[in-house]
Design a protein with these regions (language model features):
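Polyanionic/metal-chelating signatures
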Residues: 147, 153, 158-291, 427, ...
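Bacterial N-terminal signal peptides
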Residues: 36-46
């Protein structure tokens, strides 16, 4: 309920549509190929003109690729990091200098799992495209078709240093939820940067409920989908040949799962209980080439060595410390610290409903794991490990190359912070995505400017009227 109230407040003012682009295209009705060319050229020209040579000078630079550079200079050009130079290095001619003295400079935050951009209000079905309860399709569903770049939470998260996010569907009719996407939070980004990025599956209690009421039923449904995909790969799944077989998934679903079998898409499995994790860890040996990623894994610490041996990464919230269900009786805030200590790659995300539209809180979750390490008997993370969990680790899990770091050739997703980004009192002062400085205005800042006492009335819009 608190999440619904929060999101409803964000929608207090309706966003006005930008009609300029629509008006300019009216003369091209009936010529979709010309419209596509014009739109594409306009976007390229806009991005090229916005990118410039920038030197961020004098900050405490967290590279995620080596030691922290105090007083360093980060050079950006053409949407990429050119170099991170030491303190006192000369700034090349032609670079606009941005003063970061006394500030922290880091890679942008990457949300490991979220539902930002696809669920404006979770409690309203018409504003929530994360699940399809009655659709005949399941694994074939592609979440990118629901991405709304005008969603209220996107500029809010961008203003708090989040530059990219992994968005995941929720299971509806079956335990196969569908294909998630990866998005950039850049202003004007109208489509995901990677439309079909992974397959998302629910196991454990949720998977059991969707598959018929038990974990054995969930395992059969999970492996049946992969077996049908394997049959399709070798040409055995055909309409005439299979007309007398009891097919549990559609051909479209099977085609989507062939990408999982080939390793083109990671298979993200939401699972918590230690015994369920052991069961899911059997998948890579049953289907060689499958790239498995565990999501949530509240009891992962109990089988951390097995997860590490299997070289399977984990994406989790990291804040669960109460037995919220029978599959999470072993939940503890030492979970992430124990898994990382065992050698597991762990990224932080917001897979839970109340937090899924709030990836802006990830730095604070990471900071809590640093504090956890200071408690007697608890296991947490070092500062470097915690910050990597919200930057470099998700980039590694999803094959994003050098994103999540500041080094030559890395994407120029950079945030200048007022202080330590894992401290609660810190805020993002400037945000660059692919080398373009981003606006930090949000719905909240507009409302504050409109309604705070002492604002000059003549320069403000009228309040809402019925």
């Amino acid at each position: 309920m608190s999440g619904l109230i929060h999101q409803s407040c964000l929608l207090f003012h309706a966003r006005r549509s930008n009609l300029v682009a629509a008006n300019s295209m009216r003369g091209m009705r009936g010529r979709p190929e010309m419209r596509a060319v014009v739109i594409g050229l306009a976007l390229i020209a806009s991005a090229a003109s916005a990118q410039e040579q920038v030197a961020i000078v004098g900050g405490r630079v967290v590279t995620n690729a080596g030691a922290i550079v105090d007083g360093g200079t980060v050079l950006l050009n053409g949407g990429a990091v050119v170099a991170v130079n030491p303190a006192g290095a000369a700034v090349p001619a032609g670079f606009r200098q941005v003063d970061a003295r006394g500030k922290w400079v880091t890679p942008g935050i990457i949300a490991g799992i979220s539902q930002i951009g696809v669920a404006e209000v979770h409690g309203v079905d018409s504003a929530n495209d994360t699940e399809a309860d009655t659709s005949a399709a399941s694994a074939a569903l592609m979440l990118d078709g629901a991405f709304n770049p005008n969603e209220t939470s996107i500029p809010i998260s961008r203003a708090d240093g989040v530059t990219s996010a992994v968005i995941a569907p929720k299971p509806g009719r079956t335990l196969y939820a569908g294909q998630g996407a990866i998005i950039s939070l850049a202003e004007g980004q109208i489509a995901p940067t990677r439309a079909r990025a992974f397959q998302y599956v629910a196991y454990g209690e949720t998977g059991a409920r969707l598959a018929g009421g038990s974990r054995p039923a969930a395992w059969i449904e999970l492996t049946n989908g992969l077996e049908e995909a394997k049959r399709l790969q070798v040409g055995l799944m055909m309409p005439m040949r299979d007309q007398h077989r009891d097919l549990r998934i559609t051909r479209d679903d099977a085609e989507a799962l062939t990408l999982v079998l080939r390793g083109a898409h990671p298979l993200l499995v939401r699972v918590d209980r230690a015994s369920d994790i052991r069961q899911i860890l059997k998948l890579p040996s049953l289907y060689p080439g499958l790239r498995l990623v565990l999501v949530s894994a509240n009891e992962g610490w109990m089988v951390a060595n097995e997860i590490a041996r299997a070289k399977v990464p984990v994406i989790t919230l990291g804040m669960d410390n109460l037995p919220g269900s029978f599959e999470a009786l072993g939940a503890t805030m030492s979970n992430v610290g124990r898994m990382v200590a065992a050698g597991v790659t762990v990224a932080l995300g917001t897979p839970d409903l109340d937090a899924s539209f709030q990836p802006r809180l990830l730095p604070h979750y990471a900071g809590n794991l640093v504090a956890q390490a200071k408690l007697p008997g608890a296991v947490g993370l070092s500062w470097e490990q915690a910050f990597a969990a919200i930057t470099r680790a998700p980039a590694e899990i999803f094959g994003l190359g050098s994103q999540g770091s500041l080094q030559g050739g890395a994407p120029a997703d950079v945030v200048i912070w007022s202080g330590d980004p894992l401290e609660l009192s810190t805020h993002a002062e400037r945000v660059f995505i692919r080398g373009v400085e981003q606006p930090l205005e949000t719905r909240q800042t507009k409302l504050a400017r409109r309604y705070l006492p002492g604002q000059p009335a003549g320069e403000l819009p009228v309040e809402y009227r019925r």
